[in-house]
């Protein structure tokens, strides 16, 4: 007999029974909720979790969409990962740093060994759209931290190495999108298909670098 757990949903005030090990995504579909802008994450006993989260005992759940600040952060992190994959696919060996927020987006420093042209920006947008349209899963992977550190070190991701070394945790969760891996503090969507709204454009600052701005809530 399959063991079941009880989920109490704050969105519609309903309670349901699910097999132990079910995910938040499973619960959302079982509840038949209608969220035009989500869900992108959920509060589980008031702690924000990604939709990959699995239940092993009774929980209170509130699903979140992009109209909440927490939901928008989940959307933005997921979009960042798509951007990372797109520029790596197009410009192997490039350096991308996501910097400070700007109006309705983020200021990104992309170094590809030459000035960025409008055609480059268009190519990035198109590659991101291809990744979104393919609805590729974001896989959440747990591994010993020392293994994750070594993997990021082999890929030259020194900032991730320093970050994980500073935590001192025994195990680490990181994400994989197709063949691209990265570490994010916080949840992502379950797949790229939920990232319907985004844009990429050139952005010039006071020095001679050319950058990108990544709007995350474009009308």
Q: Model-found features: residue ranges?
A:
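Ubiquitin-like/PB1-type beta-grasp interaction modules and other compact soluble beta-rich domains
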Residues: 1-80, 84-85, 91-102, 126-127
